[in-house]
């Protein structure tokens, strides 16, 4: 049973985190293990679990800060990795996209960009050049693209920020379809 007093809850979380970190270190980052994302592009390994735990901790720390009216930006490096981790872990799937095939680009102000392609074969995420970084290269046609800081993109991906708070180019209705999609895998 979870403790109810604040100090006891903080101590329980710290001890639980140390148990998880100890088990992950003992296993090693490449050691295979159970994950809740068997059909994604993320590795089913202790390293994958550790990477995901960083994102969960960052987002839930934001939640706690927002609950007391003092939300802080996510740490930049964690947020940059967080966009990619979310797309590879949560979005990537072999479940068919039930709509017309399309792509979504996610552009972080810090200079990284990712593309999520969705079609009858599912969803796949890749890194793509940031807009304006490749001379003479025309951007690929995408259904919609979302622009913001990496932290804003992570919070958008985890449904902490509505689409209207970020710049969305293209068909904004596609963003609604993506956010509502619940793949079977």
Question: In which residue ranges do the predicted regions lie?
Answer:
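Acidic/His-leaning functional-site neighborhoods
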Residues: 106, 112-145, 149
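Short amphipathic alpha-helical/adjacent loop interface patches that line ligand
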Residues: 17, 57, 150
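Short, helix-capping/interhelical loops that line the mouth of catalytic, cofactor-
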Residues: 1-35, 71-81
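C-terminal interaction segments
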Residues: 137-185
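Short, contiguous alpha-helical
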Residues: 35-95, 153
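Short, solvent-exposed segments of well-ordered alpha helices
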Residues: 4-7, 44-51, 144
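A glycine-rich beta-turn/hairpin centered on an aromatic-Pro dipeptide
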Residues: 83-116
């Amino acid at each position: 049973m979870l403790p109810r007093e604040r100090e006891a809850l903080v101590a329980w979380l710290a001890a639980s985190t140390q148990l998880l970190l100890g088990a992950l270190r003992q296993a090693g980052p490449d050691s295979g293990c159970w994950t809740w994302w068997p059909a994604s592009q993320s590795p089913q390994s202790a390293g994958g679990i550790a990477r995901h735990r960083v994102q969960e901790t960052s987002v839930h720390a934001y939640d706690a800060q927002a609950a007391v009216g003092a939300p802080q930006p996510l740490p930049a490096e964690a947020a940059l990795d967080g966009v990619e981790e979310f797309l590879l872990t949560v979005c990537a799937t072999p479940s068919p996209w039930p709509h017309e095939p399309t792509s979504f680009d996610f552009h972080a102000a810090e200079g990284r960009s990712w593309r999520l392609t969705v079609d009858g074969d599912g969803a796949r995420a890749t890194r793509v050049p940031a807009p304006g970084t490749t001379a003479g290269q025309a951007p690929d046609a995408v259904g919609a693209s979302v622009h913001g800081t990496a932290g804003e993109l992570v919070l958008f991906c985890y449904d902490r920020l509505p689409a209207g708070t970020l710049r969305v180019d293209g068909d904004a209705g596609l963003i609604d379809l993506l956010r509502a999609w619940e793949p079977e895998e």
